[in-house]
Amino acid sequence: MTQDELKALVAQAAADYVKQEVPEGAVLGVGTGSTANLFIDAVAAFKERFAGAVSSSEASTRRLQQHGFKVLDLNEVDEIPVYVDGADEIDASGAMIKGGGGALTREKIVASVAKRFVCIADGSKLVQTMGTFPLPVEVIPMARAAVARKLQALGGQPRLRMTKEGGIYKTDNGNVILDVAGLKIDDPRGLEQAVNQVPGVVTVGLFALRGADVLLLGTGDGVQRTDY
C-alpha cells in the first residue's frame, strides 16, 4: 500500500473509533495535517452526532466548515472527550514530534484539554528514537536569534522555516518556526521542559509531557492499535 492509502486507512479507523467512543452531543477535537484532513473527510459522514468541533488550525477550521461542521471556540467548551491528530514521529512510549504543518501550539492546547489523544499515523512515523524529523519550535519573532543560539547550545541545528515562495513562514498566531535538526531525543520529557523554558519560545513540537493515549497505525497488515 502507498503512504496515501495507509493514511486513508487509518483515518477511516479513527472515524470508526470516535463513532464508537465519543458520546452523541459531545465536542470533537480535530488536529491538522494531511492525515487529519482525511479524518475530517471520513468523520463528516456522521457529523450530526457531534455538538461541534474544536480545531487546531485555520486550515482545519475551513475544511470542517466546508463539510458543515459547527466549529467552536475552545473558550466556549468545557470538555473534549477525544482529540484526533497525526504526528511527524512517535515512539514506543507515545511521545511525539508534531508541528510539521505549523500548528503545534494550538495542537498542544487542544490536546491538553482532551481526555484522550488519539494519534493517527502511517507506519513510517513509528520510530525507536525521535529526532530524524527536525523538531519544530514556535518562537516570538523578536527572540528568533536568541532562541536559535540556545537551541545550538543544546546540540541542535536550527533553521528558520520559510514558505515555498521564499518568505518567512508565519504561524496562525503570527510567530515564526525554527526547525531544529541534529537532536537525538533520548529524554523527550526533559527536552520538552528545557526548550519550553527558553525565553521567547511559545512551545516546542515535542508532545511527551502530554503524549498519545491511543495510536492507530496504518500498516501493510491493516491498522494496529496501541494503548499507552
Curated annotation (Swiss-Prot):
One of its GO terms (biological process) is pentose-phosphate shunt, non-oxidative branch. The keyword Isomerase applies. Its EC number is 5.3.1.6. Disulfide bonds: none annotated. The keyword Isomerase applies. InterPro entries: NagB/RpiA_transferase-like (IPR037171), Ribose5P_isomerase_typA_subgr (IPR020672), Ribose5P_isomerase_type_A (IPR004788). SUPFAM superfamilies: D-ribose-5-phosphate isomerase (RpiA), lid domain (SSF75445), NagB/RpiA/CoA transferase-like (SSF100950). Pathway: Carbohydrate degradation; pentose phosphate pathway; D-ribose 5-phosphate from D-ribulose 5-phosphate (non-oxidative stage): step 1/1. GO terms for molecular function: ribose-5-phosphate isomerase activity. Coiled coil: none annotated. GO terms for cellular component: cytosol. Keywords: Isomerase. Transmembrane segments: none annotated. Homodimer. HAMAP family: Rib_5P_isom_A. Belongs to the ribose 5-phosphate isomerase family. This is Ribose-5-phosphate isomerase A. It comes from Cupriavidus necator (strain ATCC 17699 / DSM 428 / KCTC 22496 / NCIMB 10442 / H16 / Stanier 337) (Ralstonia eutropha).
